[in-house]
Amino acid sequence: SYGTRVAQQYAMRHPQATHSIVLDSVVPNAQGLGNIFARNLDDALALQFGVCSKDPACKGKLGDPRAELDRLLATLRSTPPTVHYRDATSGEWKQGVLRADTVAGLVRMYAYMPLASGLLPKLIQEANGGHYAGLMALAQMMSGEMQDAMAMGMQLSVVCSEDARSMVAREEDAGTVLGNLMPKGMAAMCAV
């Protein structure tokens, strides 16, 4: 994370004031973060979804979660459905279009919450059966929470100054859940 980078820089510049630091998700300072999201997410999903795939009861009920996700994303890319869903925050009925990018973003954020990510295989299976309301409600709820929780201006100030040049579309990311969504989106924001 960029917070980790700040901690590393502080420790490097002020060793006399740093007794110890605890870092989570350490990435070398020289590595651009813009192009590691897609591969890292797919690696995390392989571990998370692998738990279900190795459990006969889970696999029997939900199939192969990664294959189910890939099937859902393909469907949403070709024909994104209009979904009637109940807003998880207000309880109001709403309508919206469920897009592959929305689901990819949802899956990305849930990779940070392993306990909550246990919901995804079931919701993905339901969506593949044409029942999109649960997934749409969760995606909209997550989107609203993230707008309040993430300081995009702060993140972009660091991303754009440190990693903008490294954010390029890469062929090897095309088959991942995120594809080139993150580097393209961040590069566009940094260009403004």
Located regions from the model:
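A catalytic-pocket lid/entrance helix-loop region that shapes and gates access to the active site
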Residues: 9-72, 112, 122-133, 137-146
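Short, flexible loop/turn elements at secondary-structure junctions
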Residues: 2, 25-27, 164
